[in-house]
């Protein structure tokens, strides 16, 4: 049962090639529409969202943030949001439900922040290990806690996104598997429940994309 349940996340292979990972790059097909002479309502709406995110990330980074650094996190938000939404459609592979992708995004970002911070702002990074107002007797204990919490950051970023994507898809799969054994009346309620769950899953895709980008921005602001 568990093997069949999680099989929706298995990358299928054709000629020993995992072609369904190519769904990650389907967003490239939408880029040419940005350069139309007359932008569509979708482009105007999307640009307004990106402008709002740019202002918010700029505020989080503070005056010490480098020019153009917000575009990294806006691109990260766009990539995750697109892949989350594509995973809601039938027969499209959900790449963000795999740690292969989420760790590939979180770990290099965290490593870059840490290397930049420890090389250029060493005293500032040491100061972060001891919260202000900590009693002297608790300082060694707090250094251990802060060090561990810093090390597990990329893991929590990746696992949070992956777990949320897996949970919603598993619920939809479980409900769908019970459909053939139900009566017509119960199937009607099942469809209503699945539609409601799909709406909630759509909200989760947006929230998790935003959380991933905001936390990455906050981690970046700590090393400046």
Swiss-Prot record:
An individual GO BP term: neuron cellular homeostasis
Signal peptide positions (record): none
InterPro entries found in the cross-reference section: ATP_synth_F0_asu, ATP_synth_F0_asu_AS, ATP_synth_F0_asu_bact/mt, F0_ATP_A_sf
Localization of this protein: Mitochondrion inner membrane
Keyword terms, alphabetized: ATP synthesis, CF(0), Hydrogen ion transport, Ion transport, Membrane, Mitochondrion, Mitochondrion inner membrane, Transmembrane, Transmembrane helix, Transport
Molecular function via GO: proton-transporting ATP synthase activity, rotational mechanism
Membrane topology: Multi-pass membrane protein
Record has Ion transport as a keyword: yes
Coiled-coil features, chain-numbered ranges: none
Chief site of localization: mitochondrion
A single cellular component GO annotation: proton-transporting ATP synthase complex
TM regions (residue ranges): 17-37, 72-92, 99-119, 125-145, 155-175, 184-204
Stated family: Belongs to the ATPase A chain family.
Role of this protein: Mitochondrial membrane ATP synthase (F(1)F(0) ATP synthase or Complex V) produces ATP from ADP in the presence of a proton gradient across the membrane which is generated by electron transport complexes of the respiratory chain. F-type ATPases consist of two structural domains, F(1) - containing the extramembraneous catalytic core and F(0) - containing the membrane proton channel, linked together by a central stalk and a peripheral stalk. During catalysis, ATP synthesis in the catalytic domain of F(1) is coupled via a rotary mechanism of the central stalk subunits to proton translocation.
Subunit structure: F-type ATPases have 2 components, CF(1) - the catalytic core - and CF(0) - the membrane proton channel. CF(1) has five subunits: alpha(3), beta(3), gamma(1), delta(1), epsilon(1). CF(0) has three main subunits: a, b and c.
Name this polypeptide is given: ATP synthase subunit a
Source organism: Drosophila yakuba (Fruit fly)
């Amino acid at each position: 049962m568990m093997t069949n349940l999680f099989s929706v996340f298995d990358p299928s292979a054709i000629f020993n090639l995992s072609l369904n990972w190519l769904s990650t790059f389907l967003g490239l097909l939408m880029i040419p529409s940005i350069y139309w002479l007359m932008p569509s309502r979708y482009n105007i709406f999307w640009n307004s969202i990106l402008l709002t995110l740019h202002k918010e990330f700029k505020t989080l980074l503070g005056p010490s943030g480098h020019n153009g650094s917000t575009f990294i996190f806006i691109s990260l938000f766009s990539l995750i949001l697109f892949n989350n939404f594509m995973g809601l459609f039938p027969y499209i592979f959900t790449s963000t439900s795999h740690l292969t992708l989420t760790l590939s995004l979180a770990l290099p970002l965290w490593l870059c922040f840490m290397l930049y911070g420890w090389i250029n702002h060493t005293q500032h990074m040491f100061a972060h290990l001891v919260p202000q107002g900590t009693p002297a007797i608790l300082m060694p204990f707090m250094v251990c806690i802060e060090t561990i919490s810093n090390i597990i950051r990329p893991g929590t970023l990746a696992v949070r996104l992956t777990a949320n994507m897996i949970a919603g898809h598993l619920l939809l799969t479980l409900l769908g598997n019970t459909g053939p054994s139900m009566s017509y009346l119960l199937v009607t309620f099942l469809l209503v429940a699945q539609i409601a769950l799909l709406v909630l899953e759509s909200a989760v895709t947006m929230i998790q994309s935003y959380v991933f980008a905001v936390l990455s921005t906050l981690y970046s602001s700590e090393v400046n």
